[in-house]
Amino acid sequence: ITEGGYNISRQSGEFMLDNAQVAHDIENPAKPVTAFGYVAEGLRRRKAAGNGPITILSCDNLQHNGNTARKAFMTFVGAQDKELAAWMEENVTFPNSMVDRITPATRPADIERLNAQNGTCDEAPVYCEDFIQWVVEDNFAAGRPAWETVGAQMTDDVTAFENMKLSLLNASHTLLSYPSFLGGYRKVDAAMHD
């Protein structure tokens, strides 16, 4: 969805049901135009088919992203379909996660360079630093992939990792970024290796 896409009011902290697209989806469940409408319709079909519990995992860069996703989707569905909202209370989990990996915006020159180097025609590549940390709250509705085998950290509470990232990592990235840029670096991890 992206960190700014949850339709949560900065003033009240509540999901904004009066958004025009959200209002459309509440009235037209079978013809959604928002992420909330599409997910709700998918969950409605899952419920109708008798399929079991499911986890919705947010990897967006905001604190308590699972709690934010839960608030947004539960408020939306509660306004659209009370029966589905009750089913979700019993069958859908929204774990929190923390992802640390810088992914700068991709520019047209980046796309051209990648395609020339690799002989590809990728119109939407994602550039990122080599470092990655992915911490996931172990709160899944019906089992989960063994992500820890590929480096993810599973935990009961992501909060300590989020606080560490904000207070230590983000501050040090900011402190290091300015002299690194002046030194010719365009990635913080490259400057740290020097």
PLM-predicted stretches and their roles:
Residues 1-194:
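Substrate/ligand-engaging "lid" and interaction regions
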